[in-house]
Amino acid sequence: MLVIRFKGWSVKLDHQVGGAGKFGIWSFHGSESSYVPDMETILRHAAIRPAEPKEGAEVEVLICDSRMPQDEWRAVGTGVAAYEAER
């Protein structure tokens, strides 16, 4: 499981499901909540750059749907990558 840590919160990602340019598209881990920007939209993916970060690397994160055009992704910031075993 890939965990991206921000100041005060984190995003848990399960596995890479695709890519777009230099971004990897990852699905949220099953224990994570979905991102719900409005009552009609549920987003369960994150676009991250680099696509497959090394432990401790800085990672840019955007919330998206795997079918969304890149200009509709929602930036959430930059965090630090960590790999954790499933609990």
What kind of region is each of these model predictions?
Residues 2-6, 11, 42, 59-63:
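Hydrophobic beta-strand residues in large extracellular and virion-surface proteins
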Residues 3-4, 25, 42, 48, ...:
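Short hydrophobic transmembrane-like helices used for membrane targeting/insertion
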Residues 6-28:
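Short aromatic-glycine-(Arg/Gly/Cys) micro-motifs in beta-strand/loop hairpins
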